[in-house]
């Protein structure tokens, strides 16, 4: 269910704002999106796994808050990010 450390590092390299960036909203949203997609795939086969479903809902809520924050701070970065991640909003 969880994404591997290698995959997480690839995502960080792709979405970071500067060389040592690991905590910008873009990076956090991209990592959360990858984790959400992994849990979503898990739930397709394990429909009764309600514990994972609750974790998924918490991740989606956290991503939504980060997206709202990014939209309020820089609308252009927000639009580029949702386009590159394929998030419909």
Curated annotation (Swiss-Prot):
One of its GO terms (molecular function) is rRNA binding. SMART domains: Ribosomal_S15 (SM01387). The keyword rRNA-binding applies. PROSITE patterns: RIBOSOMAL_S15. One of its GO terms (cellular component) is cytosolic small ribosomal subunit. It comes from the Bacteria. GO terms for biological process: translation. Keywords: Ribonucleoprotein, Ribosomal protein, RNA-binding, rRNA-binding. NCBIfam families: S15_bact. HAMAP family: Ribosomal_uS15_B. One of the primary rRNA binding proteins, it binds directly to 16S rRNA where it helps nucleate assembly of the platform of the 30S subunit by binding and bridging several RNA helices of the 16S rRNA. Forms an intersubunit bridge (bridge B4) with the 23S rRNA of the 50S subunit in the ribosome. Part of the 30S ribosomal subunit. Forms a bridge to the 50S subunit in the 70S ribosome, contacting the 23S rRNA. Belongs to the universal ribosomal protein uS15 family. This is Small ribosomal subunit protein uS15. It comes from Staphylococcus aureus (strain NCTC 8325 / PS 47). The lineage of its organism: Bacteria, Bacillati, Bacillota, Bacilli, Bacillales. The gene is rpsO.
């Amino acid at each position: 269910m969880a994404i591997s450390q290698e995959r997480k590092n690839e995502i960080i390299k792709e979405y970071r704002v500067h060389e040592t960036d690991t905590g910008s909203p873009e990076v956090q949203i991209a990592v959360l999106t990858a984790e959400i997609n992994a849990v979503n795939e898990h739930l397709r086969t394990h429909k009764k796994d309600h514990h994972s479903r609750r974790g998924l809902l918490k991740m989606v809520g956290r991503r939504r808050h980060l997206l709202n924050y990014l939209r309020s701070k820089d609308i252009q970065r927000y639009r580029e990010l949702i386009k590159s991640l394929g998030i419909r909003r």
